[in-house]
Amino acid sequence: MDIPQKYKLYTKKKIIFGIILLITLFLSSIYALCVGDYKLTVNQVVNALMGYGKDDINLVIWNIRLPRIFAAIISGMSLAVAGAVMQCILRNPLASPFTMGISHGAMFGACFAIIMFGFGGAESTGRIFINNPYMITIFAFLGALIGVVVILLLAKLRGLTPEAMILAGVAMSSLFTAGTMLIQYFADDLQLAAMVYWTFGDLGRAIWTEIYIMAAVMIPSLIYFMYKRWDYNALEAGEETAKSLGVNTERTRLIGMLVASLLTSVNVAFLGIIGFVGLICPHIVRICIGGDYRFLIPISALFGAVLLLIADTFARTIIAPIVLPVGILTSFLGAPMFLYLLLKMYKRV
């Protein structure tokens, strides 16, 4: 087999894998629309989507299940892509928004905005609300930015190894968690209920306004990462190789980390902490299709959407009518994966 034929086969396998994920995402979305306390048939779902459904079915589809599905897709894409890019930029397979402390920094910023400025809270009925989603997003981004800046400064000034950067991320996570607990200590009962509930990654709280904001951040971020795909491939080959190919490595790392932080911040501000999606998805995709970022970025996005949607559907149905926060399930999945990767790294050493 000559080189052009090998390249066609190489590309064809990746495209087929992407198509399989698209089909899986579509079927999972239909299934998620049908299952729940209020079970629906496919015909009822289609009629509601076409505008011909009954009022009660329309309410369930458009106000409850569709927002949840779109939140899962957008959040899964955002976290998976952020994780894939961070693993490249930091040259560490353990890097992700969760393990680097970015999620906890965003959580601290969001809680600070909720308590100190009253941008969100809880009603006596238990319903969580957001008064100003834009300001909460800004504060969440600022919290994440603090963690990113500290880690990058330590890496630059002290020449941290990839392993030490993960430890720095763990330290920042602990610091932000302590800050969040301090804020909780001075909160009243309703504010405390809102903050504790916020720490659970839950897609059920998403509303259309927040989904539009998440999509408005995710789409241009994904476009930017695809635009920089060749630079990321060069970085995978090594620092000196990337520089010899004309890549401004410091600028690429800085902007990549900032965009990944913004993606994470928006998701945390509206949905809470959903851990390990950014760690699991890029690794599984890399095993299946390799490390070419031309394909790794979009297929990681699809895989993240599928994983989070299936996990959320499972969380809604496993002990129905009780709905588990999806962040609990992703942590159960991600923690063993994290330990496996950690042991694998130290075996190489």
Curated annotation (Swiss-Prot):
- InterPro entries under this entry? ABC_BtuC-like, ABC_transptr_permease_BtuC
Q: Which residues cross the membrane?
A: 15-35, 69-89, 100-120, 135-155, 166-186, 206-226, 254-274, 295-315, 318-338
Which GO MF terms are attached to this record?
Answer: transmembrane transporter activity
Function, please? Probably part of a binding-protein-dependent transport system. Probably responsible for the translocation of the substrate across the membrane.
Subcellular locations according to the entry = Cell membrane
GO cellular-component terms in the record? plasma membrane
Question: SUPFAM superfamilies from the xrefs?
Answer: ABC transporter involved in vitamin B12 uptake, BtuC (SSF81345)
- The scientific name of the source species is Methanocaldococcus jannaschii (strain ATCC 43067 / DSM 2661 / JAL-1 / JCM 10045 / NBRC 100440) (Methanococcus jannaschii)
A single GO BP: siderophore-dependent iron import into cell
Membrane topology (UniProt): Multi-pass membrane protein
Report the sequence similarity comment from the record: Belongs to the binding-protein-dependent transport system permease family. FecCD subfamily.
User: What are the alphabetically sorted keywords of the record?
Assistant: Cell membrane, Membrane, Transmembrane, Transmembrane helix, Transport
Which named protein is this? Putative ABC transporter permease protein MJ0087
Q: Name the CDD domains on file.
A: TM_ABC_iron-siderophores_like
